[in-house]
Protein backbone atom coordinates (compact mmCIF):
# COMPACT_ATOMS: atom_id res chain seq x y z
CA UNK A 1 0.00 0.00 0.00
CA UNK A 2 1.11 3.56 -0.71
CA UNK A 3 1.74 5.65 2.41
CA UNK A 4 -0.68 8.47 3.20
CA UNK A 5 0.63 11.70 1.64
CA UNK A 6 -1.55 14.12 3.59
CA UNK A 7 -4.83 14.61 5.41
CA UNK A 8 -7.12 17.29 4.00
CA UNK A 9 -10.10 19.02 5.54
CA UNK A 10 -12.44 20.85 3.14
CA UNK A 11 -14.81 23.33 4.74
CA UNK A 12 -18.44 23.16 3.65
CA UNK A 13 -18.59 26.71 2.37
CA UNK A 14 -21.59 26.52 0.01
CA UNK A 15 -23.87 23.84 1.46
CA UNK A 16 -25.04 22.57 4.82
CA UNK A 17 -25.08 19.05 6.24
CA UNK A 18 -27.93 18.58 8.70
CA UNK A 19 -29.15 15.71 10.83
CA UNK A 20 -27.15 13.33 13.02
CA UNK A 21 -23.65 14.19 11.85
CA UNK A 22 -20.29 14.62 13.54
CA UNK A 23 -16.83 15.72 12.48
CA UNK A 24 -13.47 15.89 14.28
CA UNK A 25 -11.99 19.18 15.42
CA UNK A 26 -9.13 20.42 13.26
CA UNK A 27 -6.72 20.39 16.20
CA UNK A 28 -7.47 16.68 16.77
CA UNK A 29 -6.91 15.92 13.08
CA UNK A 30 -3.60 17.76 13.26
CA UNK A 31 -2.50 15.87 16.37
CA UNK A 32 -3.30 12.47 14.82
CA UNK A 33 -1.70 13.35 11.48
CA UNK A 34 1.47 14.79 12.98
CA UNK A 35 1.84 11.74 15.23
CA UNK A 36 2.05 9.71 12.00
CA UNK A 37 4.33 12.23 10.29
CA UNK A 38 1.64 13.36 7.84
CA UNK A 39 0.90 17.03 7.02
CA UNK A 40 -2.60 18.54 7.22
CA UNK A 41 -4.11 20.74 4.51
CA UNK A 42 -7.08 22.89 5.51
CA UNK A 43 -9.21 24.25 2.66
CA UNK A 44 -11.20 27.04 4.29
CA UNK A 45 -13.10 28.15 1.21
CA UNK A 46 -14.07 31.76 1.87
CA UNK A 47 -11.13 32.65 4.09
CA UNK A 48 -12.60 35.06 6.63
CA UNK A 49 -10.10 37.13 8.60
CA UNK A 50 -12.72 38.25 11.15
CA UNK A 51 -15.39 36.77 13.38
CA UNK A 52 -18.63 36.74 11.38
CA UNK A 53 -20.64 36.40 14.62
CA UNK A 54 -19.86 40.07 15.21
CA UNK A 55 -22.31 40.84 12.41
CA UNK A 56 -25.07 38.47 13.55
CA UNK A 57 -24.02 35.61 11.27
CA UNK A 58 -23.12 32.01 12.17
CA UNK A 59 -19.43 31.57 12.93
CA UNK A 60 -17.28 30.97 9.86
CA UNK A 61 -13.83 29.37 10.46
CA UNK A 62 -11.09 31.97 10.18
CA UNK A 63 -7.58 31.77 8.78
CA UNK A 64 -6.19 32.62 12.22
CA UNK A 65 -8.05 29.71 13.85
CA UNK A 66 -6.67 27.29 11.28
CA UNK A 67 -3.14 28.52 11.92
CA UNK A 68 -3.59 28.19 15.69
CA UNK A 69 -4.88 24.63 15.25
CA UNK A 70 -1.60 23.75 13.54
CA UNK A 71 -2.60 23.15 9.91
CA UNK A 72 0.49 22.83 7.72
CA UNK A 73 -1.11 24.31 4.58
CA UNK A 74 -4.17 26.59 4.50
CA UNK A 75 -6.06 27.43 1.29
CA UNK A 76 -8.72 30.12 0.94
CA UNK A 77 -10.20 32.66 -1.47
CA UNK A 78 -8.99 36.21 -1.95
CA UNK A 79 -12.53 37.41 -2.72
CA UNK A 80 -15.78 36.30 -1.01
CA UNK A 81 -15.58 37.04 2.73
CA UNK A 82 -12.06 38.43 2.54
CA UNK A 83 -13.27 41.04 0.06
CA UNK A 84 -10.36 41.28 -2.37
CA UNK A 85 -9.91 40.27 -6.02
CA UNK A 86 -10.80 36.77 -7.17
CA UNK A 87 -7.80 34.62 -6.29
CA UNK A 88 -6.70 31.48 -4.53
CA UNK A 89 -4.34 31.93 -1.57
CA UNK A 90 -2.06 29.28 -0.09
CA UNK A 91 -0.19 29.88 3.16
CA UNK A 92 1.70 27.51 5.42
CA UNK A 93 5.04 25.97 6.29
CA UNK A 94 7.91 27.27 4.19
CA UNK A 95 9.19 23.85 3.10
CA UNK A 96 5.76 22.79 1.85
CA UNK A 97 5.13 26.11 0.09
CA UNK A 98 8.51 25.67 -1.64
CA UNK A 99 7.40 22.27 -2.99
CA UNK A 100 4.13 23.74 -4.25
CA UNK A 101 5.98 26.54 -6.04
CA UNK A 102 8.04 23.94 -7.93
CA UNK A 103 4.96 22.16 -9.29
CA UNK A 104 4.48 22.60 -13.08
CA UNK A 105 0.97 24.00 -12.55
CA UNK A 106 2.18 26.77 -10.26
CA UNK A 107 3.27 28.96 -13.17
CA UNK A 108 -0.03 28.46 -14.99
CA UNK A 109 -2.20 29.52 -12.05
CA UNK A 110 -0.05 32.24 -10.52
CA UNK A 111 -1.66 35.61 -9.89
CA UNK A 112 -0.84 38.51 -12.22
CA UNK A 113 0.41 41.91 -11.08
CA UNK A 114 -3.04 43.51 -11.14
CA UNK A 115 -4.45 40.79 -8.91
CA UNK A 116 -1.51 41.02 -6.52
CA UNK A 117 -1.88 44.81 -6.31
CA UNK A 118 -5.57 44.51 -5.46
CA UNK A 119 -4.95 41.77 -2.93
CA UNK A 120 -2.14 43.74 -1.28
CA UNK A 121 -4.37 46.82 -0.99
CA UNK A 122 -7.16 44.75 0.57
CA UNK A 123 -4.89 43.07 3.12
CA UNK A 124 -3.39 46.43 4.08
CA UNK A 125 -6.86 47.58 5.13
CA UNK A 126 -6.99 44.63 7.54
CA UNK A 127 -3.51 45.37 8.88
CA UNK A 128 -4.51 48.99 9.48
CA UNK A 129 -7.74 47.86 11.19
CA UNK A 130 -9.84 49.77 8.65
CA UNK A 131 -11.61 46.89 6.88
CA UNK A 132 -15.04 47.96 8.15
CA UNK A 133 -14.54 51.31 6.47
CA UNK A 134 -12.68 50.34 3.29
CA UNK A 135 -13.47 46.71 2.31
CA UNK A 136 -16.95 46.63 0.69
CA UNK A 137 -18.13 43.21 1.95
CA UNK A 138 -17.10 43.99 5.54
CA UNK A 139 -18.49 47.51 5.29
CA UNK A 140 -21.87 46.22 4.13
CA UNK A 141 -22.09 43.56 6.85
CA UNK A 142 -21.15 46.09 9.54
CA UNK A 143 -24.00 48.47 8.68
CA UNK A 144 -26.75 48.67 11.30
CA UNK A 145 -30.38 48.10 10.39
CA UNK A 146 -31.11 51.76 11.02
CA UNK A 147 -28.34 52.80 8.64
CA UNK A 148 -29.75 50.56 5.92
CA UNK A 149 -33.27 51.86 6.56
CA UNK A 150 -32.00 55.44 6.35
CA UNK A 151 -30.35 54.76 2.99
CA UNK A 152 -33.48 53.15 1.58
CA UNK A 153 -35.70 56.00 2.79
CA UNK A 154 -33.34 58.63 1.37
CA UNK A 155 -33.30 56.84 -1.98
CA UNK A 156 -37.09 56.56 -2.02
CA UNK A 157 -37.42 60.27 -1.27
CA UNK A 158 -34.97 61.17 -4.04
CA UNK A 159 -36.70 58.94 -6.59
CA UNK A 160 -40.17 59.93 -5.51
CA UNK A 161 -41.20 56.34 -6.07
CA UNK A 162 -41.15 53.03 -4.20
CA UNK A 163 -41.86 51.73 -0.72
CA UNK A 164 -39.34 50.85 1.99
CA UNK A 165 -40.05 47.33 3.32
CA UNK A 166 -38.32 44.91 5.70
CA UNK A 167 -36.55 41.95 4.10
CA UNK A 168 -33.68 39.48 4.25
CA UNK A 169 -30.32 39.48 2.48
CA UNK A 170 -27.78 36.71 1.99
CA UNK A 171 -24.00 36.93 2.08
CA UNK A 172 -22.75 36.29 -1.47
CA UNK A 173 -20.30 33.87 -3.02
CA UNK A 174 -21.87 30.79 -1.46
CA UNK A 175 -19.97 31.71 1.68
CA UNK A 176 -22.70 31.17 4.27
CA UNK A 177 -25.38 28.74 3.01
CA UNK A 178 -28.86 29.05 4.48
CA UNK A 179 -27.81 32.22 6.29
CA UNK A 180 -29.57 35.55 5.97
CA UNK A 181 -29.42 38.90 7.69
CA UNK A 182 -32.32 41.32 8.23
CA UNK A 183 -32.37 44.37 5.98
CA UNK A 184 -34.59 47.02 4.45
CA UNK A 185 -35.47 47.11 0.75
CA UNK A 186 -36.77 49.69 -1.67
CA UNK A 187 -39.70 47.95 -3.34
CA UNK A 188 -40.67 49.14 -6.82
CA UNK A 189 -43.80 48.12 -8.71
CA UNK A 190 -43.13 47.97 -12.47
CA UNK A 191 -44.79 46.43 -15.52
CA UNK A 192 -42.17 43.69 -15.89
CA UNK A 193 -39.76 43.06 -13.03
CA UNK A 194 -37.46 40.88 -15.16
CA UNK A 195 -37.15 43.46 -17.95
CA UNK A 196 -36.57 46.24 -15.44
CA UNK A 197 -33.91 44.15 -13.68
CA UNK A 198 -32.05 43.57 -16.96
CA UNK A 199 -32.20 47.29 -17.76
CA UNK A 200 -30.74 48.15 -14.35
CA UNK A 201 -27.87 45.69 -14.82
CA UNK A 202 -27.08 47.11 -18.27
CA UNK A 203 -27.00 50.64 -16.89
CA UNK A 204 -23.68 52.50 -16.60
CA UNK A 205 -22.83 52.03 -13.82
CA UNK A 206 -24.76 48.76 -13.39
CA UNK A 207 -27.37 48.68 -10.63
CA UNK A 208 -27.68 45.30 -8.95
CA UNK A 209 -31.20 44.54 -7.74
CA UNK A 210 -33.37 41.46 -7.27
CA UNK A 211 -36.91 40.38 -8.07
CA UNK A 212 -39.52 38.97 -5.71
CA UNK A 213 -43.19 38.43 -6.57
CA UNK A 214 -42.75 40.38 -9.81
CA UNK A 215 -41.51 43.45 -7.92
Q: Which residues fall in each region the model found?
A:
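Conserved PLP-enzyme active-site core in the AAT-like
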Residues: 1-125, 159
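Structural motif of enzymes handling amino- and sulfur-group chemistry
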Residues: 95, 103-104, 111-159, 167-168, ...
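Serine/threonine-rich low-complexity intrinsically disordered regions
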Residues: 23, 51, 93, 136, ...
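Conserved C-terminal alpha-helix-loop-beta "cap" of PLP-dependent enzymes
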Residues: 145, 149-215
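Proline-rich intrinsically disordered, low-complexity coils
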Residues: 3, 24, 39, 104, ...
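Arginine residue identity/basic-tract feature
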Residues: 9-12, 107-110, 133, 149-151, ...
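Short secondary-structure junctions and interdomain/linker hinges
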Residues: 73, 107, 126-130, 162, ...
Amino acid sequence: EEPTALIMRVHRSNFKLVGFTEEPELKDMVAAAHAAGVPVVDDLGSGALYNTEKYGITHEPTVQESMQAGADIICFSGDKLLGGPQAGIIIGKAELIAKIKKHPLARAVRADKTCLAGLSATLLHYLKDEAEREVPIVKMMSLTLEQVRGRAEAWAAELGHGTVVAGESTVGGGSLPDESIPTFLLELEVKSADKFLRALRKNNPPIIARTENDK
